[in-house]
Amino acid sequence: MSKVKKNDETLSEVLVDVNRVTKVVKGGRSFAFSAYVVVGDKAGRVGAGHGKAKEVNEARGKAKQAAKKRMMKVPLYQNRTIHHDVVGKSGAAKVILRRAKAGTGIIAGGSMRAIFDSLGVHDIVAKSIGSTNVYAMISATFDALNKLASPKSIAMRRDKKVNEISVKSAEIQVNE
């Protein structure tokens, strides 16, 4: 959605993937590390970043900085789930995110679970279709999160009142 200023103290960091890469040169092999990190404040802000370096800790630090630069705000319904179902794509990876009733929990696989934990979502159902590559999955999940909109923002875009959009939107406005 929109870029957000970041505050280090409140951010949680999750290391999603570390990969050792090898470059074959004339003198032998050169090793390096690649890291993917998700950061979030557990209150609707989340970001993901990728870092590469000769040491794991350096790669993790670079990834964290990149994730903080790419943080975005996501509208949440009652600070526990998303407002509506949404589909995100990235290459061959496709992700379906569905809102869930209170008490459902996070039903999602690996890298998606890390994003939802960092985001502060408590109830969601997520299904991945196609590629299960970590980078593609995270990218597809962020694509889906970018498509989310609150009923209030949809009403403003259409120059209408929230209760004119749909019956469910009227219920949401009353509950907020």
Swiss-Prot record:
Q: Name one GO cellular component term.
A: small ribosomal subunit
Q: Which HAMAP family match?
A: Ribosomal_uS5_B
PROSITE patterns (UniProt xref): RIBOSOMAL_S5, S5_DSRBD
What name does the UniProt record give this protein?
A: Small ribosomal subunit protein uS5
What GO annotations for molecular function exist for this entry?
rRNA binding; structural constituent of ribosome
Q: What is known of its domains?
A: The N-terminal domain interacts with the head of the 30S subunit; the C-terminal domain interacts with the body and contacts protein S4. The interaction surface between S4 and S5 is involved in control of translational fidelity.
As recorded in Swiss-Prot or TrEMBL, the protein's gene is named rpsE
The entry sums up its family as follows: Belongs to the universal ribosomal protein uS5 family.
Assembly notes: Part of the 30S ribosomal subunit. Contacts proteins S4 and S8.
Task: Kindly state which keywords UniProt assigns to this record, in alphabetical order.
Answer: Ribonucleoprotein, Ribosomal protein, RNA-binding, rRNA-binding
Q: SUPFAM superfamilies, from UniProt?
A: dsRNA-binding domain-like (SSF54768), Ribosomal protein S5 domain 2-like (SSF54211)
Residue intervals of the S5 DRBM domain: 11-74
Q: Which organism is it from?
A: Rickettsia conorii (strain ATCC VR-613 / Malish 7)
Q: Name one GO biological process term.
A: translation
- UniProt xrefs under PANTHER family: MITOCHONDRIAL RIBOSOMAL PROTEIN S5 (PTHR48277:SF1)
